[in-house]
């Protein structure tokens, strides 16, 4: 296992609620709420048309394309820095109820004995998300989003992270295993299902469109909860209807995060179910542990009986062929107790069938292993070693 900074499994169940950002928590693309207007002469739609055209022309990731265009259009117009991007983020409008949603849901979970963690998984800009009031108030456990690398003056010089609709899913696995650092290869380590910090059944994914489908599908297939949201002002449900028809989401609701809304009621119901279900899961894994212990004990008992039967058969062997067959079965056994080793040593000295063929390859290998397992030096082991050395 790698030297991972893995978060340990909690004593209480953890429910991870993962959100897209644009049109999920905010009514519009974050870049279109002040930034594009300040650096681009055309309308917002034209900005995206040009950005997508550049991506198509150069076979470029669409997110890299918009990040490049943001920097390019800013030249000679504004000083683009990390701070200015966060300032633009502070202007981003949020859907009703979002401001107090995260802490309110966290407190509801606490009442039910469930730890609630909120995560952003977005193709938008991390810097702008971090500039929002909710992020500054500590709403998010982790923000996974596209971001820039900056020089010592805070000016963007290169993309640091690009999150697109296909690689979004890796962050769900990071959350599942508690390996949150984007560069930590520990996400690839194997963990038994009962050791997952946040099993997929305890992951909620909330999104609005096709770019969320891979995450929604992954969560759905693994027993989690995927929710499609739509703008309550336009009441356009075409996208959520399509996602529901394609089995991408289990539920849909207006993007209204106020107390008592459809979404609020739905998420609280999921929290209630999580609290009850984790009690059952805990009992299941206790039963599984007891079953494994019993199975191992049974295997040990069967193995011990099998070894005794082979020792008795070897002691009574009356032909070389039978002896070789028995030794072949014994070579498959990895562990022998000291008492069993003593019995086997006595047989080698007393049974002429065994003693005579000690120099045969299979018998020789077996008895060398027995002497090593026995680990004691006495007259009997000395005699066996002499017989093995002399080929007699």
Predicted regions and their residues:
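Alpha-helical substrate-recognition element adjacent to the catalytic core
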Residues: 2-152, 243
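Long, compositionally biased charged/polar accessory segments in the mid-to-C-terminal portions
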Residues: 53, 346-347
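Long, low-complexity, intrinsically disordered N-terminal extensions of eukaryotic proteins, enriched
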Residues: 1-9, 14, 46-49, 312-315, ...
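C-terminal cap/substrate-recognition subdomain and adjoining C-terminal extension
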Residues: 96-119, 123-339, 347, 355-356, ...
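Low-complexity, intrinsically disordered regions enriched in charged/polar residues
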Residues: 30, 41, 54, 58-61, ...
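C-terminal accessory/interaction regions of large nucleic acid-associated machines
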Residues: 353, 363-367
């Amino acid at each position: 296992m790698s030297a991972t900074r893995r978060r340990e499994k909690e004593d209480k169940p953890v429910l991870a609620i993962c959100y897209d950002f644009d049109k999920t928590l905010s009514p519009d693309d974050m870049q279109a709420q002040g930034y594009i207007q300040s650096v681009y002469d055309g309308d917002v739609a034209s900005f995206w048309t040009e950005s997508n055209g550049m991506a198509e022309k150069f076979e470029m990731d669409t997110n890299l394309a918009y990040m490049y265009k943001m920097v390019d259009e800013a030249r000679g117009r504004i000083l683009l820095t990390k701070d200015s991007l966060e300032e633009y983020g502070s202007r981003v409008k949020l859907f009703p109820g979002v401001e107090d949603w995260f802490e309110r849901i966290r407190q509801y979970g606490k009442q039910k004995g469930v730890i609630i963690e909120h995560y952003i998984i977005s193709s938008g800009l991390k810097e702008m998300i971090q500039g929002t009031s909710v992020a500054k108030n500590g709403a998010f456990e982790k923000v996974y989003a596209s971001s820039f690398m900056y020089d010592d003056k805070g000016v963007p010089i290169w993309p640091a992270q690009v999150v697109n609709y296909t690689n979004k899913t890796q962050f769900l696995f990071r959350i599942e295993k508690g390996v949150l650092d984007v560069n930590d290869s520990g996400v690839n380590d194997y963990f038994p299902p009962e050791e997952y910090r946040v099993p997929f059944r305890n992951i909620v994914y909330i999104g609005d469109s096709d770019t969320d489908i891979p995450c929604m599908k992954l969560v759905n297939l693994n027993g989690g909860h995927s929710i499609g949201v739509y703008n309550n002002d336009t009441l356009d449900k075409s996208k959520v209807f399509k996602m529901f028809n394609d089995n991408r989401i289990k539920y849909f609701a207006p993007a209204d995060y106020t107390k008592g809304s459809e979404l609020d009621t739905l998420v609280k119901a999921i929290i209630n179910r999580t609290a009850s279900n984790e009690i059952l899961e805990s009992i299941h894994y206790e039963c599984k542990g007891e079953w494994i212990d019993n199975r191992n004990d049974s295997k040990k008992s069967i193995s011990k009986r099998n070894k005794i039967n082979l020792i008795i058969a070897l002691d009574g062997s009356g032909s070389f062929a039978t002896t070789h067959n028995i030794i072949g079965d014994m070579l498959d056994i990895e562990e022998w107790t000291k008492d069993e080793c003593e019995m086997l040593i006595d047989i080698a000295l007393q049974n002429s069938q065994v003693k005579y063929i000690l120099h045969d390859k299979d018998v020789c290998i077996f008895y060398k292993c027995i002497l090593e397992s026995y680990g004691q030096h006495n007259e009997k082991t000395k005699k066996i070693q002499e017989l093995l050395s002399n080929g007699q």
